[in-house]
């Protein structure tokens, strides 16, 4: 068998050009908005991606997979469903990824105070934004290679130090809880050489961010991916914005 590398990053096998091994990403929560854009950006940069949505079929991600020439695989996962998470964990148990990135976020009314929010709504936001992303990290961290990256989509509103204007009280609390849980994970894995990231993408024009947000998805997500890429092979936990600047805890 003829097998040789050439400068273009290709292999010649039986006279055919083949891509050398691509980097791989597992992106959780990619049905729309920031998560979907992350998948698009990594595909555009030549990665192979496994991404999750809640739907069995018919989503924009499924349609993207059909056009991806095999570089995108779609798996089903409701991030709050522990049974689905365990099923996916078994399905992917022998897979290894350079990047695990978890994107999840819901919000209640921005002006609803902690004294007004219903208990059920408080639980919904906390479970979706804090508990469930960390359950993903706990269940899939062994799928990430030794020099890989584990990232979670946080928010600048998760910063306790920067909370000077109020508003979004429950959402802020949920992202602050996420940050604290990720920090506890990092403390338990202090000898881990992988990069651990909390990413604040900025106020982005999404369904949740609204039309008046400062940044478009097309502005934010390439910067987010640049920031993730720049931190590769940098061990320990960092809380960074889309520009790679440190966010105060």
Language model features: what each stretch is:
Residues 25-29:
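Conserved N-terminal Rossmann-fold NAD(P)-binding element of oxidoreductases
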Residues 106, 110-126, 134, 142, ...:
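Catalytic loop of short-chain dehydrogenase/reductase
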Residues 31, 35-40:
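N-terminal Rossmann NAD(P)H-binding glycine-rich loop of SDR-like oxidoreductase domains
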Residues 79-95:
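Conserved Rossmann-fold cofactor-binding substructure of NAD(P)-dependent oxidoreductases
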Residues 191, 198-199, 210-249:
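C-terminal helical subdomain
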Residues 45-61:
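Conserved glycine-rich Rossmann-like NAD(P)H-binding loop of the short-chain dehydrogenase/reductase
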Residues 67-83:
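Rossmann-fold cofactor-recognition segment
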